[in-house]
């Protein structure tokens, strides 16, 4: 994940886009709206691509989603914490689902 985050950070540096070296929440309402709208657009593109069984467009949407997510992570200055955050979510999810069987999970 560090490679992807560093690549997007370089993009932000070249194009004078914001990023933070420390965790922050206040990135400005305009940036929050932009990040939300970019992710929303890619989610919709993914939905259409998956619904239409278009593997190339699914891959494109997933790649764009990852790129936008990396940009959002570095805007919030969480690039040095995101793997730890992910690991904690993984641990929590694993504990949450240990009592469920696969048929139970997929019947929700």
Language model: regions and residue ranges:
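Extended low-complexity intrinsically disordered regions
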Residues: 1-52, 100
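An amphipathic alpha-helical micro-motif enriched in hydrophobic residues
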Residues: 39, 43, 55-83, 89
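Conserved small/polar residues in nucleotide/adenosyl-binding loops
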Residues: 98-104
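N-terminal low-complexity segments that are often proline-rich with Ser/Thr-Pro
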Residues: 107-108
């Amino acid at each position: 994940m560090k490679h992807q985050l560093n690549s997007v950070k370089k993009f932000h540096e070249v194009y004078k886009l914001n990023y933070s070296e420390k965790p922050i929440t206040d990135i400005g309402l305009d940036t929050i709206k932009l990040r939300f709208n970019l992710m929303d657009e890619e989610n919709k593109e993914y939905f259409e691509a998956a619904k239409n069984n278009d593997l190339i467009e699914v891959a494109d949407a997933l790649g764009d989603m990852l790129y936008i997510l990396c940009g959002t992570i570095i805007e919030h200055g969480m690039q040095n914490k995101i793997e730890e955050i992910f690991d904690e979510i993984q641990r929590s999810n694993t504990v949450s689902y240990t009592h469920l069987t696969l048929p139970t999970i997929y019947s929700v």
